[in-house]
């Protein structure tokens, strides 16, 4: 693609002028993420180029002002680390304003989120934002032409099902692996399901962060829940009483149903802030002094230990090189060590050394992490936790918006 960049770009432009551009469905392959099978789509370089242009120049600017600040996924300057900082700031804010850790948190997510986004409703939402924000008529016309073509590649072949079964799929939850391993002879293209978006394409990221915006507005504006945030399909809300959160959950479920989304009531839970709860694979609890105790999910440790042993087998068989192993481990440890105890960091480092006979190296920085990896803990026991600094003491009756001046609250 790079060798013929200018020529390929000219061909793409010509296809747009003549109306002959049609995106390719791409290459779909399965992965297993924490025990959950998922279908990932890899687009062609031509389609990636078009998607980047569409999202960077049109979609992202059009939807950004309609997203709440605590919507932390797939946006420039945000991400998992940003969302976790905001989440902890919300916990501190609650303690500062109420002077106690006696409260509750609602943790909720959607069931089969990406696979169950209805195309017609989603296009309607995107169309609303585009008409408001895109001033250039030609840009708007091209975008309105392009989006249905992209959604066409998201459609799933359901030719082997009856009309009644397809109707049930549109009304209920469908399996994202619906066509995985199915005989190609059964996928005739006679019937297509207009539901679900591909994981792996850039337009899907924009869709994922904006489509449930009405639920965010319901929580923030209608119910006035300041301590609310969302990361793709994982949402949280903090309130003083369980009843407030139950009422919020019922309202969110009604809004979600209107948009064809399914809230997972089995996984939705309301727990005390003083007890241990998990959000984005980190366990938290708010103490009576306002400190936040953070702890890595033990399953993450177990999973990474198994991965290291699998990497060792692959390395011995010559299927991967050491640099791949080292980079994978450094990536994992670099994003998790702040939520691990001294013992956990040291034990993971020791296992790595035992398997590979050397320790991972960074070109610069990570001095504190290097020390934890090289020195065993002197404490007799370890809770496997780290704690964030406590917020300032509450000063009623003057409200304090946040103990962390870095953040603002909408």
Task: Give, region by region, the residue ranges found by the protein language model.
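Active-site-proximal segment of RNA-dependent polymerases
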Residues: 55-118
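Right-hand nucleic-acid polymerase module
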Residues: 48, 52, 178-179, 184-194, ...
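A structured, charge-rich N-terminal accessory region that forms the first stable segment of a protein
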Residues: 1-17, 22
């Amino acid at each position: 693609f790079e060798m013929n960049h200018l020529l390929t770009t000219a061909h793409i432009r010509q296809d747009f002028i003549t109306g002959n551009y049609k995106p390719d469905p791409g290459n779909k392959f399965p992965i297993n993420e924490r025990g959950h099978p998922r279908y990932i789509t890899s687009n062609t370089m031509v389609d990636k180029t078009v998607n980047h242009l569409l999202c960077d120049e049109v979609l992202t600017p059009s939807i950004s002002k309609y997203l709440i600040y605590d919507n932390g996924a797939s946006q420039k300057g945000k991400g998992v680390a940003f969302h976790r900082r905001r989440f902890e700031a919300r916990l501190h804010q609650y303690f500062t304003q109420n002077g106690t850790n006696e409260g509750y948190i609602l943790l909720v997510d959607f069931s089969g989120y990406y696979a169950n986004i209805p195309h017609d409703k989603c296009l309607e939402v995107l169309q609303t934002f585009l008409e408001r924000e895109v001033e250039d008529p030609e840009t708007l016309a091209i975008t309105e032409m392009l989006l249905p073509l992209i959604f066409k590649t998201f459609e799933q072949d359901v030719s082997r099902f009856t009309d009644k079964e397809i109707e049930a799929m549109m009304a209920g939850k469908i399996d994202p692996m619906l066509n995985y391993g199915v005989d190609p002879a059964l996928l005739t293209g006679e019937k297509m399901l207009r539901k679900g978006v591909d994981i792996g394409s850039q337009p899907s990221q924009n869709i994922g962060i904006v489509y449930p915006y009405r639920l965010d507005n319901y929580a923030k504006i209608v119910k006035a829940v300041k301590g609310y945030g969302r990361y793709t399909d994982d949402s949280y809300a903090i309130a003083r009483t369980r009843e407030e959160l139950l009422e919020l959950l019922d309202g969110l479920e009604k809004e979600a149903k209107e948009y064809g989304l399914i809230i997972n009531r089995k996984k939705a839970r309301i727990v005390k802030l003083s007890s241990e709860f998990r959000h984005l694979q980190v366990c938290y609890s708010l103490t009576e002094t306002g400190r936040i105790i953070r702890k890595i999910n033990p399953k993450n440790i177990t999973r990474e230990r198994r991965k290291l042993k699998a990497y060792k087998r692959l390395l011995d068989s010559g299927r991967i090189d050491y640099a791949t192993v080292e980079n994978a481990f450094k990536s994992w440890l670099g994003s998790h060590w702040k939520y691990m105890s001294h013992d956990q960091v040291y034990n993971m480092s020791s296992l790595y050394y035992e398997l590979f006979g050397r320790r991972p190296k960074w070109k610069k920085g990570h001095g504190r992490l290097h020390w934890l990896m090289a020195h065993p803990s002197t404490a007799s026991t370890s809770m496997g936790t780290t704690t964030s600094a406590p917020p300032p003491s509450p000063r009623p009756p003057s409200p304090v918006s946040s103990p962390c001046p870095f953040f603002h609250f909408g």
